[in-house]
Amino acid sequence: MSNCFNPANILLPNDGIDMEKWSVIACDQFTSQADYWEAVEKHVADAPSTLNVVFPEIYLGTIENQENDCNLSGAGVKNDKETGRKTKYASMTDDERIKYINTTMDTYLTDGTLKQAVADGYVLVERTTESGVRLGIVGLIDLDDYDFDPKKKTLIRATEGTVISRIPPRVKIRENAAIELPHVMLLVDDPIDRQKIDGCQGATQEDAVNIAAVKHGIIEYVYAIKDTLRKLYDTELMQGGGHIRGYAVEGEAAKQVTEAFAAKQNSCGGFLFAVGDGNHSLATAKTCWENIKKSGKFTEEQLKTHHARHALVEICNLHSEALEFKPIHRLLTNIDVKDMLSFFEAEITKQGLESTEGDEIVFEYVESGSCDSAKPANGNEVVSENNDGRCTAPIKNSGINITNRGDRLPVEILQGILDKYLETHGNVEIDYIHGDEALHGLVKETKGCGIFLQSIDKSTLFPAINAGGVLPRKTFSIGEANEKRYYMECHKISM
C-alpha cells in the first residue's frame, strides 16, 4: 500500500513580497458579506496576492452567467448589479474572472512572484487565533485514496454530503489552473502524548530523527522541535485573522514525518483522515483528477506522476485544544417566515417528532409592524434600534429542542425539512453563516430568517463518519469565520 500523505515541492512568495497582503481567507467564507471582500480588495490594491488567483464565492454565479450554468446553487450570491457596488472583481463575469486567474497564475510563476520554498518536504504551520495556537502540517494527499461518495470506504473521507451541483462551476475554475492554493484542512484522530512532547524542550537537530517513532501527537512533536527548522514566513493575517508562522520540514525530518504518518495509516483501520474544511474544494480536485484519467491524454506511467494526482492540504489534529468545532447557521432570504415556520411544525409532526422550548434550533427574524406593536412581551422578543434610539422593526426568536430524535442530530432534521421546503419555494435562498453576530446582523439587513444551531462534540466525528458515511452538509465549522484557513502555500498541478 502506498502512502496517502506525502511530501511536496511547495511554492511561496519571493522575498520582499508583503505576506500580509499575499494571504487572504478561504474563498467560501463571507458569502453574504460583500463589505468584507470589498475591504480585502481595497487593502490588497495592486500588491501580489492570493486574492488574484482565487475566486471568492460571493462573486461566483453572477446574474450574467446563470444562463451558462455557472450559478452557485444555494450560496446566497450577490453581484454588483444587486449590491450597487462596482469593485473590480464584483464587476467581472465568471469567465472573465477565471481567465484572469489563469493568466495571473502564469505570471506569478514566470515573473518571480513565486519561488520553490520547500523541496520534497512539508510546512509546519503555527496559526494563532482567539481560540489558541492551532498547528498543522501541509503536504500532499493522493486523490486515489479519497472519495466523496460515502459508500466508498477510502483512507480519506468527506464529512458532509456533497452537493453535486456545486462541483461543475468549481471544476471550471480548477481545470486549466497552473497551481492550486489549499484551504482544505484534514483531521487526523491522533491523541497527544504530552509527556513525550514536553520532553522535547530545548530540542536539537538529532531529535528530528525520532519523529518516526512518535505514535501519538505527530504534529505536536514536530512543533516541539520547531526551533531546529527553517522559518519560512511570520506574518499577521488581514481582517482579524490572527498570526501565522511557517517552518520548512525538509531532509531527514521530512522522511521521518512521512514514516510517522505511514505507520499511522497502517494502524488506522482503513480510515486515516476526515475532511474538516473544504469538502467541496477537495471534491472538485478529485473530479478534475478523474477527468484527467478518463481523457486518454496520458499513459498509465504518466498518470502515476501527474501533478494533479495529488492535492495540497493541511493536516490538523482533532485533539488540538485550539481546534474548536463551531456550528454553521442558516440564513433564509426572500421568505415568508410564517409560512416556513408552519411548514416546519407540520413536518415535525408528520415525522412523529416532539418538541419543547429550547435552544437546539433557534429561529430569528424581523417581525413586520410598528414600534407600538413591538413592545416585548417576553424574553423571546427584542426591539432593534437605530443609533439615535429610534425604534425600527422588532426581532423575534423562538427556539426548540426535539425530545425524541434518538441519535439523529438536530441539524439533520432541520436540513431535511429545509431541503423539502426549498423544492417547492424556488424564490427562497439559503446561505450558510459562521458566527452568531454575523447572523444577527444579516437577519436585520436582509429581513430574512436566521436559524441558529449548536455545535457538535468533535469526539463523535470519526465514529459517526466510520459508522454512517457522512454528516448532514454544513454541520460544523473549524473555528469562527476569521479563523478559517488563509491561502499561503502553492503547489503546481499542471504538467
Task: Describe the predicted segments one by one.
Residues 1-232, 460, 465:
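N-terminal extension/subdomain marker
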Residues 66-83, 368-398:
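Intrinsically disordered, low-complexity terminal tails and inter-domain linkers enriched
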Residues 174, 186, 278, 442-443, ...:
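A residue-level signal for conserved active-site and pocket-lining positions in enzyme catalytic cores
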